[in-house]
Regions:
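An N-terminal assembly and electron-transfer interface module characteristic of large anaerobic redox
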Residues: 1-182
Length: 182
């Protein structure tokens, strides 16, 4: 374990993180992040609470992390809103929502849990991935500003031409439906 501890110290993580997933390794990853210096405020997992997770939960909570078992998407997103992390690690819908705000985010399954985390090389490489993502905040802001409004509201969906905002048409159709229902 001293070799893993040394590897974690060579690439410290300085930032607030929320983490959520459904794989079962969320508590382990959160511990590695905290041991690397990260401020992990929330750990959500789809897995149930078991006797085997008790020691990890106790340790994580002693470090200020809220652990949510059988976490829902709504709970994961609420944690993001509450803790305003520098980086959110999560499932596809979490990452999608977080990126819309211009906050860096990583897919837990593809970029974190798929990594070999045991041993000095695996645990030590976690810092590279996390730090690189947190440094991309400016790029996320540029992308958010560039794409703002695209695919939202009247422009949502697939279009052959430039979408037109047909609010008056929709209002007329809504009135027709309401009248027909009465």
């Amino acid at each position: 374990l001293p070799a893993i501890e040394a590897a974690l110290k060579t690439k410290p993580i300085d930032g607030r993180i929320t983490l959520s997933g459904y794989e079962g390794s969320e508590l382990l990853v959160a511990r590695l992040l905290i041991e690397s210096g990260a401020d992990v405020r929330y750990v959500g997992t789809a897995c149930p609470k078991t006797a085997w997770s008790a020691a990890d939960v106790e340790w994580l909570e002693s470090k200020g992390a809220k652990v949510q078992f059988r976490a829902s998407l709504e709970q994961d997103l609420a944690a993001f809103e509450e803790f305003k992390p520098d980086l959110a690690i999560g499932t596809t819908p979490v990452v999608q929502k977080v990126k819309e705000t211009g906050t860096p985010s990583l897919y837990f399954t593809n970029l974190i849990s798929a990594r070999p985390l045991m041993g000095p090389a695996g645990a030590g490489s976690l810092g590279d991935v996390i730090n690189a993502a947190m440094k991309s905040k400016d790029r996320f802001d540029e992308m958010r500003d560039f794409f703002e409004g695209v695919g939202e509201g009247h422009a949502a969906g697939v279009w052959e031409d430039v979408p037109k905002d047909e609010r008056t048409f929709r209002m007329k159709e809504k009135r027709k439906r309401i009248t027909a229902e009465q």
